[in-house]
Amino acid sequence: MNILMKSIAISALLIISSASAQNLFPILGGQRAGTSVFTFLNIGVSARAVGMGESVVALNQDASSIFYNPAIIAQLENTEVSVSQIQWPAEINYDYFSITHRLFGRNYIGFNGGILHMEPMLETTEYHPEGTGNYFRFQDRFFGVTYGAKMTDRFSFGMTIKHVAEDMAGHHMSAFLLDMGTFYWTGYRSLRFCASLSNFGQQVSPEGTYEKRILDQN
């Protein structure tokens, strides 16, 4: 009986190990597919904000603040313009701009946008690791419109509707996303309570076609 139980246990372990081994050797080119999109929206657009760990939801600094909290727009009385460029390794660049303006009374409007782009990259595959001779482009971009208003001298709210798109090697995907924020000044020195919800929107999937090749693993 003990021998039978041991045999069953060993067989079960072998089956589990075989199933796990298949996950250790995924099909080449398919690793970590579909994990996340539009991750460029996590890139900071202000040197000051990045230096503070991007804990700037309550910081009414300049026009770039609407990227972190749309409600800040109602705290900027004058017309503000912010422009930045970030140069990453491998010739990757991120350009950003934002502008805010007081419409009338306690109503404010702003625009912002960013584009992550790179030089054409040589296409490589499992069969041609040194390159196929073809080149492809990659680009992420967004453009947003922000509206904010002062409800009282201490409380304001704001929202941003933005269109986000990605193009990579002939594949395209896009979506509309929403940012919302609130700003409340307590009246005690610089103590503020703020909240911000960023990049809330629909599910996104790429458009286009692709060719799937499975290598012989034997």
Predicted segments — roles?
Residues 22-50, 59, 86, 93-218:
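Outer-membrane beta-barrel porins/channels
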Residues 46, 75-78:
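A short, polar/charged loop/turn motif at coil->beta-strand junctions and beta-hairpin connectors
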Residues 12-21:
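Hydrophobic h-region of N-terminal signal peptides that target proteins for export
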